[in-house]
Amino acid sequence: MKDFFKNVAATIVGLFAFGLIMTILGFICIIGMVASSNSKPALKDNAVMVMKLQGQIEDRTEDNWLGELTGEQFNNIGMNRILSSIRKAKNEDKVKGIYLETGILETDYATLQEIRNALADFKKSGKWIIAYGDALSQGGYYLASVANKVYVNPEGNVDWHGIASQPQYIKDVAAKFGVHFTVVKVGKYKSYTETYTEDKMSDANREQVSRYIGGLWLQMLGDVSKSRNISKDSLNRYADGLMVFDDTKLLKSRKMVDGFCYYDEIRDVVKKQLGLKADDTINQVDYNDVDMTIDDSNLMGEEIAVYYCQGSIVRMETPSIYDSEQQIVSTKVIKDLQELADNSQVKAVVLRINSGGGDAYASEQIWRAVKELNKKKPVVVSMGGMAASGAYYMSMGDQYIMAHPTTLTGSIGIFGALPDFSDLMTKKLGFKYDEVKTNRNSTYASAGMSRPWSAEEIATMQNYVNRGYSLFRNRVAEGRKMSTEQVEKIAQGRVWLGTDAKKIKLIDGFGGLSDAIDKAAELAHLSSYQAVEYPALAGWMEQLLDMAGGNKGTYLDEQLRLALGDLYQPFIMIRNMKEKEPIQAALPYVLNIQ
């Protein structure tokens, strides 16, 4: 019997050792694959940079190694990498032009505009851009239209339909499950809560949405009209007529494209542009590899920190196994900004913000950290597709603010959506509750679960929101050098397009991320400088450990995006409903711009 237990123990130890060895070998294989994928050939002369863009474009993204290994990756593209590659290709003599291929792009119009402006700047160097698509989405065509030549498949199409917003309302759906909502808010334009309490747009919401989507469309019309030499009236007529279903041949006569070719034939077009013969090989470099193949002579001088803030503003990180949405975690951001303030090597900071806001308390704490940072060194805010409500709040520390004409900003207001699940719990599911308490409001924490919200609780929450709005308004007045009366006229939760925001002094100037970096250098009196990105991105090992601990939902989130399509955003909205802090300084609704 003793020998039996020895053999069992030896077997267990052997199996454990074998498993450990296989795990180590697996990690070595992964490291090898990552290392081999990072090994890029030297750039050859007479080269073309290939840009194939499809998927979701964000300001900055982590490399998703798990998706790459499984081959089931939903493309998340970093705008910072796109802009860097275009700039480097412009300054590299070996790169003669760009081949641009666009598919379905999921991003905001300000991001598209920033990339488009970078491509236009690339052309100013005398280099060319050739764009191609089997079928071009509206966003894809907006990018492609800046090219010298645009080609489409002979049986392809161009989707050009204008812009629409279709908010979703869940009041009746929620009521079927015994769920109701009570709203406390300040601001007639603060219409986020309409999603839960109404079945259509309010007049105020319709007014602001009409204003800014009309402004977005005018920007697109102007840019495409100038690049393609097509009148705005013609472009509007094409959008009205469901051009995506028209005969493809009409695209050339309408000057939307320059020609037609199949995918294999576009190579011949590029060869001709490079002066190559039919049997010559094209020297090409993928835009993702440019950082490793082109030396950047601009990486010298004093350091300007570019700190990225993307996603919802929260007090503490709220991880999920199936949602990879980025978050602006106030505790982490404050710590990072304090470190940048104390870092003598950092001479200025660019705060890159792309957020619809979030927790009001967290926004106030970040506001103070930014203000304290600005006392030690210049801070410039660079607004992406949106920097609204809480994201605008945190920008009010007296610093210079830059945005795009198509940025959505403002939304100075606060709301609270108080969900009431008591009918679901007691009438639908049959839960029973009883209580013993020492004071009148001892059970306030269970309001909306065991019982409806009381009139006293609702009134107290409304007073709380009123104080928060007053503080928000005062922060804006102080930061923008305005009176509270002036702020009130442009507040009330209203969302403003960048073009209007500059007129009413919510921002200081127009420009993209590179312009903001240049402005920070100017304010810091720097003649030579380099931009360094913060916070540091997680490596593959950190991503693995996070996923093992249930702290990242990147992979499962990608599967949800692919499976749900247009239903993804409503699903996430409903799932997050109960997790949010009750008082929010957030964009007045979930954006749904088509």
What is the role of each PLM region?
Residues D3-S39, N46:
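Hydrophobic alpha-helical transmembrane signal-anchor segments
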Residues A17-L20, L25, N38-L43, E68-T70, ...:
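Non-catalytic accessory/assembly modules
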Residues K40, A47-P167, S297-L424, N466:
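Cleft-lining beta-strand/loop regions that shape enzyme active-site pockets
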Residues P167, K171-V270, S422-I504, D508, ...:
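Charged, glycine-interspersed solvent-exposed loop segments at helix/strand-loop junctions
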Residues K226-S227, D258-E303, F415, R473-G479, ...:
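C-terminal long alpha-helix characteristic of the crotonase
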Residues G301-I304, Y308-S344, Y464, P535-Q594:
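Intrinsic disorder and flexible/low-complexity segments
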Residues Y308-G311, I353-S355, M383-G385, P405-T407, ...:
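Active-site proximal loops enriched in glycine and acidic residues that flank catalytic Cys/His/Asp
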Residues A360-Q365, D500-K503, Q543-A548:
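Short glycine/threonine-rich loop-to-helix capping motif typified by GTGT followed
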